[in-house]
């Protein structure tokens, strides 16, 4: 299932498989994303008038803010980028400018479209790769041979291609010409500098420059796949589609927005650069034109989802103009002991299932008693209460601590089944959680 026209109910049902509770936040996101689909069904003139209602999510770290947005963008194949507001600086200061988040979104969008085109041409690309390798392995026919010899050669070439495709010749070595590795371009610089970089690369590093390399057939397949993909793909069409998709259905998730809010408690110690970042962010969220290396993009139809814990500040500490650009607000609930237990047992790819799969690679079967899972949830919740509340992320730390000896000595347990009991969890974590200092430094 990966479609843009999922109904809000279907969206929430999908999110329920991965994220426990937070029903209100899921509902807000589902409606916002469904409205993207609804807008695209309207007449062009009306489409221009309808802008997305941006969302402000308020909640502690680890309660599912990012995961809700990320999962949604993934299933609906929307261009998505997550940024942290605290990483940006006001124009004129050293650091990243806010426009770079839009450039990152466009980069991700073009890559998303490119991968879709590659997937559609997958069979054609693989056929071309196999044919090229087969012709390298099979010496060419001399000119002037009989029709019978030509037919024999064609049959041999076909058999060779079948063997290459099935991986029978993966270990054979072959000498092929491959393109020189392209020079990486820093996409976080302004478009003017990007163009200078690209022009310099064209002068000093020609696209057609190739080098001969001896590779295994398996390695040659990968090297040629990238080269043939570039030949078959329409780069210009991909760029245009990527730009269009970022503009009409892109999602920018701005985390830690509370870090650029100027708390009224700070009084005379207000940080002018924080307010400066907010003012730089305002035109992007309101709707402006940003230049990227692929072309210009209008930001007025991009959906912005901002998130923050707001422990030291309040949403009202943001400048009024920016507050007005996030009309939908939703507060995410803190994780209780019961929710922690549900995260471990009811999510589709729970942490427990992940660790079981990892250790199964070593031939170790791990089983968790229900009491052990309840104890893990309880101790993780207690650790959050005694130290920094990091939500569900605490579960990763506690399970890692319980399983560290088994993970380290996995070869000794190969072919065995290991049951994690409540007593084992208590012996590994009980003393640590009881001691506040140890909780802060170890868990």
From Swiss-Prot:
Signal peptide: none
Tree of life domain: Bacteria
Location within or outside the cell: Cytoplasm
Name of a matching Pfam family: AAA
Disulphide bridges, residue numbers: none
Positions with a binding annotation for ATP: 20, 62-67, 255, 321, 393
Keywords: ATP-binding, Chaperone, Cytoplasm, Nucleotide-binding
One Gene Ontology MF term: ATP binding
First-listed, main subcellular location of the protein, grouped into a coarse class: cytoplasm
InterPro entries assigned to the protein according to its UniProt record, in alphabetical order: AAA+_ATPase, ATP-dep_Clp_protease_ClpX, ATPase_AAA_core, Clp_ATPase_C, HslU, P-loop_NTPase
Claim: Phosphoprotein is one of the keywords in the record: no
UniProt keyword rRNA processing present: no
GO biological process: protein unfolding; proteolysis involved in protein catabolic process
GO CC annotations on file: HslUV protease complex
Function: ATPase subunit of a proteasome-like degradation complex; this subunit has chaperone activity. The binding of ATP and its subsequent hydrolysis by HslU are essential for unfolding of protein substrates subsequently hydrolyzed by HslV. HslU recognizes the N-terminal part of its protein substrates and unfolds these before they are guided to HslV for hydrolysis.
Protein family: Belongs to the ClpX chaperone family. HslU subfamily.
Cited HAMAP family: HslU
Quaternary assembly: A double ring-shaped homohexamer of HslV is capped on each side by a ring-shaped HslU homohexamer. The assembly of the HslU/HslV complex is dependent on binding of ATP.
Protein name per its UniProtKB record: ATP-dependent protease ATPase subunit HslU
